[in-house]
């Protein structure tokens, strides 16, 4: 699928094997990896979006305009950069401070423009950091937010690379699934051409996370969290 659609070859714009009514676009190289591997980050996170939208545009044109799929794109709060106000709303300026954030912001603009032209009907959801994520840790810079909960609960050590005063914005996997389902049924005409939306979440500090874990599982679990500052993540 990747080779057929995303190798920058124009003849593959017509190679989309199916014509879905709704597309949930979740795929990406995660933040830490996108920062360390610049070329791969842009190729996977931005150029694949462009080529997939081109493939859907070809289906739209081939249907004489009848085919207009709904695209739900999982963007990120990484599109924002400081300094931050007390509250961030949908009108806050997008000034990403990472390659990952820049790639997500680029995809938001691509999706908005393809939607403006009527090729697709897209909405970008700026998801909070999903916590607690299941499975193993990945290369996302925010992975530790889940790790300091998930690993200790499984009797494993977890690395905390930032100060406990760090505040972040979280949503659960269940909440994220609900956001996606709701967006799929949303009348985009209500958005007045503002197709990138901030989503609700829980704002808390790392210290508050750890205290919640302590109340739920006890002090012995907290001892499995090791403080190891990491300038790459801190900055």
Protein language model regions, located:
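Active-site Tyr-X1-5-Lys
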Residues: 82-84, 95-123
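SDR active-site strand-loop-helix element
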Residues: 23-29, 71-77, 125-128
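NAD(P)-dependent short-chain dehydrogenase/reductase
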Residues: 112-167, 173, 177
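Conserved Rossmann-fold NAD(P)-dependent oxidoreductase catalytic core, especially the SDR/UDP-sugar
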Residues: 50-97
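NAD(P)H-binding glycine-rich loop region in Rossmannoid oxidoreductase-like domains
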Residues: 6-44
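Hydrophobic positions on the long internal alpha-helix
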Residues: 48, 52-56, 110-111, 179
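Glycine-rich NAD(P)-binding loop of the Rossmann-fold in SDR/ketoreductase-type enzymes
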Residues: 22, 36, 40-51, 94, ...
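C-terminal substrate-binding subdomain of Rossmann-fold SDR/epimerase-dehydratase oxidoreductases
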Residues: 161-163, 169-235
């Amino acid at each position: 699928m990747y080779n057929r659609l995303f190798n920058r070859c124009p003849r593959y714009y017509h190679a989309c094997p199916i014509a879905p009514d709704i597309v949930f676009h979740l795929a990406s190289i995660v933040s830490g990896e996108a920062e360390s591997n610049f070329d791969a980050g842009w190729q996977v996170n931005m150029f694949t979006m462009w080529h997939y939208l081109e493939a859907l545009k070809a289906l739209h044109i081939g249907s004489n305009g009848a085919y207009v799929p709904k695209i739900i794109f999982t963007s990120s709060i990484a599109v924002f950069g400081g300094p931050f106000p007390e509250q961030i709303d949908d009108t806050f300026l997008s000034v990403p401070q990472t390659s990952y954030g820049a790639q997500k912001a680029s995809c938001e603009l691509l999706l908005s423009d393809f939607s403006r032209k009527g090729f697709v009907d897209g909405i970008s959801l700026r998801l909070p950091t999903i916590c607690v994520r299941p499975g193993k840790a990945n290369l996302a810079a925010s992975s530790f937010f889940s790790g300091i909960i998930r690993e200790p609960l499984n009797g494993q050590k977890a690395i905390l690379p930032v100060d406990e005063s760090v505040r972040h914005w979280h949503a659960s996997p269940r909440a994220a699934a609900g956001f996606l389902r709701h967006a799929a049924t949303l009348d985009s005409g209500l958005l007045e051409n503002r197709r990138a939306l901030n989503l609700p979440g829980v704002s808390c500090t790392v210290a508050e996370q750890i205290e919640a874990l302590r109340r739920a599982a006890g002090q012995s679990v907290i001892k499995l969290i090791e403080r190891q500052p990491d300038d790459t993540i801190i900055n």
